[in-house]
């Protein structure tokens, strides 16, 4: 069901993250006031109207945050997103990924404002790929388990909330170096680098994902949407495509398979997402070659 036009003041948690900072920029570019919330490093003043350092686990401070700023919508992206850390610190993962999400959802419900939440493709087991929004979740690591639990907690507390399941993302960071930049630094210094040929994702860049979140976060109520890219490719293929686009020899990136390594957190084989539902609603996903061109040339897709 369609709702009202985009709100004038949006609270963004996890605002200093790689995706969060792009979401803040997209909101500002469309004239929206941004309340950027982070626990450690405040977002640069050019990317937010208001900047707040806050421990989201502090319920009293969370109440004060809503009372003081009275947001017209919330995009909740703060999370403990490292699967290994989630395995090593399960209580912290549960607190940050589930309980904080539940608390924010309850406040959005009580104040009657739209909420959007970024989940992950890792809620699926990766046995077949090309997952639809209606497919049952079946996570195989703790991060995926806790994000799946967070989805349900949010739905129970705030039934109108929109849940975005995000793929593996890449691109330049607005606030701090991204994994892609680290890969390129390794290549420039002839340091060893490898990618898995049997780990498949429907990857997309941060800017494209952020534009989709901003476009759709108040357009629907109570929906789950997949915001994957058009193409499914292995991590190795993605890394080699990036290397080639930036003028490096892609063969310098060694091919490995998951069986070559031992991981604390299980890694699914193919968690590619079917994102046709979001694209039908206006989510614009360029082909990988076009994304690479923009990353190298510094152009964008705002007019597509």
Language-model features: locations:
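NAD(P)H-binding glycine-rich loop region in Rossmannoid oxidoreductase-like domains
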Residues: 53-96
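N-terminal Rossmann NAD(P)H-binding glycine-rich loop of SDR-like oxidoreductase domains
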Residues: 8-30
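Conserved C-terminal active-site "lid" loop/helix of NAD(P)H-dependent oxidoreductases
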Residues: 234-240, 257-304
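NAD(P)-dependent short-chain dehydrogenase/reductase
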Residues: 152-201
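Catalytic helix-loop patch of NAD(P)-dependent Rossmann-fold dehydrogenases
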Residues: 95, 99-103, 123-164, 170
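NAD(P)-cofactor binding segment of oxidoreductase domains
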Residues: 88-116
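Glycine/proline-rich active-site loop of Rossmann-fold NAD(P)-dependent oxidoreductases
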Residues: 148, 170-181, 189-191, 207, ...
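Mid/C-terminal beta-alpha module of Rossmann-like enzyme folds, strongest
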Residues: 210-213, 219-264, 303-304
């Amino acid at each position: 069901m369609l709702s009202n036009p985009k709100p004038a003041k949006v609270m963004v948690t996890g605002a200093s993250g790689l995706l969060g900072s792009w979401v803040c920029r997209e909101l500002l570019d469309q004239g929206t006031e941004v309340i950027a919330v982070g626990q450690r490093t405040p977002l640069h003043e050019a990317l937010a109207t208001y900047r707040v350092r806050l421990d989201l686990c502090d319920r009293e401070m969370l109440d004060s945050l809503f009372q003081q700023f009275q947001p017209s919508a919330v995009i909740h992206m703060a999370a403990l997103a490292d699967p290994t850390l989630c395995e090593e610190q399960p209580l912290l993962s549960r607190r940050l990924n589930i309980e904080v999400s539940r608390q924010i959802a309850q406040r959005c419900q009580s104040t009657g404002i739209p909420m959007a939440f970024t989940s992950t493709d890792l809620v699926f087991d990766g046995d077949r790929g090309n997952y639809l929004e209606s497919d049952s979740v079946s996570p195989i690591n703790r991060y995926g388990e806790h994000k799946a639990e967070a989805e349900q907690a949010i739905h129970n507390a705030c039934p109108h909330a929109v849940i975005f399941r995000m793929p593996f993302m890449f691109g330049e960071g607005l606030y701090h170096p991204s994994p892609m930049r680290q890969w390129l630094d390794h290549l420039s210094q002839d340091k060893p680098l490898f990618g898995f040929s049997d780990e498949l994702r429907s990857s997309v860049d941060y800017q494209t994902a952020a534009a989709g979140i901003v476009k759709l976060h108040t357009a629907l109520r109570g929906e789950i949407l997949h915001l994957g890219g058009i193409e499914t490719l292995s991590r190795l293929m993605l890394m080699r495509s990036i290397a080639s686009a930036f003028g490096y020899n892609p063969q310098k990136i060694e091919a490995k398979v998951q069986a070559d390594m031992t991981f604390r957190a299980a890694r699914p084989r193919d968690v590619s997402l079917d994102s046709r539902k979001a694209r039908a609603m206006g989510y614009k996903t360029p082909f990988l070659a076009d994304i690479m061109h923009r990353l190298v040339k510094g152009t964008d897709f705002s007019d597509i």
